[in-house]
Amino acid sequence: MLKMESTQQMASSIINSSFEAAVVAATSTLELMGIQYDYNEVYTRVKSKFDFVMDDSGVKNNLMGKAATIDQALNGKFSSSIRNRNWMTDSKTVSRLDEDVNKLRLLLSSKGIDQKMRVLNACFSVKRVPGKSSSVIKCTRLMKEKIERGEVEVDDTFVEERMEIDTIDWKSRYDQLERRFESLKQRVNEKYNNWVIKARKVNENMNSLQNVISQQQAHINELQIYNNKLERDLQSKIGSVISSIEWYLRSMELSDDIKSDIEQQLNSIDHINPVNAFDDFESILRNLISDYDRIFIMFKGLLQQSNYTYTYE
C-alpha cells in the first residue's frame, strides 16, 4: 500500500504561499506609500517575523498536525483521528478553549482595544483605493449575520444633515450592499459544497480502506487457523512416528543398552515445534547411519583377517 502524504504537502504549500503573499503585500504597500525599500531586506525581515509568529503561535504545528492526522486516516491508521475527535468533543477541551478566548479578550482590553473596537473590527474591514486618499468600507460575514438576526439598530439621536449639493442615495447603497451580501453568500455556499464533496470522498476512501483491512484480516485469520491445524497434525504425526519406532525397537533382539540409547534419543525429539523435531530426526538418522558404517567397517576387517571376501547382491 502506497504511503500518502498529500494533505501534509498541501498544508506546507499553503503556508509557503501565505509567506509569499505576505512579502508581496508588504512590498506593494511600501510602493503605494512611495517609500523606497530594499527587496532582499524586506524579504528577510518578513520571513524572520513570519517564521517566528507561525512557530511561536503554534499555528504551523497545528496545521501540519491536522494534515498528518488526515494522511494517517487515508493510510488506514485511524487512532490519531479518533483521539482528535474525542479531544474536540470533550468538555475539558471546550472549557480550556473558552478560557483561552477569555484570556485573549483580557489581553486585548489591557492593550486598550475595548469591546467597541473589537466588534467594529470584526464587523467591518477597510479597503484602500489605489491612487486615492479615500477608502471603501466592507461589511464582514459577522455583520451580515447580525443584520439577519436583527442585532443592528439605528441610533435615533443621530441627526442627518443633508447637503444641497451632495445627496447620498441610501437606497442604492443598500441595494449594492445587498448584492454584495448575496455574492458573498453564493461564494460561501460554493466553498461549503466543495468541502462537503471532498469530505464525502474522504469518507468513501476511509470506508473502502476499512473494507480492505477487514478482508485482509479475515484472510489472515483463515491462514492462522489453517497453520494451527497443520501444526497440530504435524505434532500428532511426530508423536505417532515416535511411538511406532519405540514399539518396533522393543521387538528387536538388540541389547538393552542399545535400546535404552535409542529410546533416549527418541525422547529428546521436540514434540511441540515441528521444525526442531525434523532436526532431531535428522540427528538420529545420522547417528544410525554412522553406527551402521562403523559396524560395516568392523565386519569388513574381520572378513579380511579371516581371508574371506564379500560381495553385494
Swiss-Prot record:
Q: Which residues form a coiled coil?
A: 166-237
**One Pfam family from the UniProt entry?**
Rota_NSP3
Segments carrying the region annotation (Dimerization) are 150-206
The Gene Ontology CC terms held by the record are: host cell cytoplasm
Region annotation (Interaction with host EIF4G1) maps to 208-313
Would you indicate the residue range of the signal peptide? Answer: none
Q: How does it assemble?
A: Homodimer. Interacts (via the coiled-coil region) with host ZC3H7B (via LD motif). Interacts with host EIF4G1.
Instruction: Specify the protein name.
Output: Non-structural protein 3
Instruction: Specify the species.
Output: Rotavirus A (strain RVA/Human/United States/DS-1/1976/G2P1B[4])
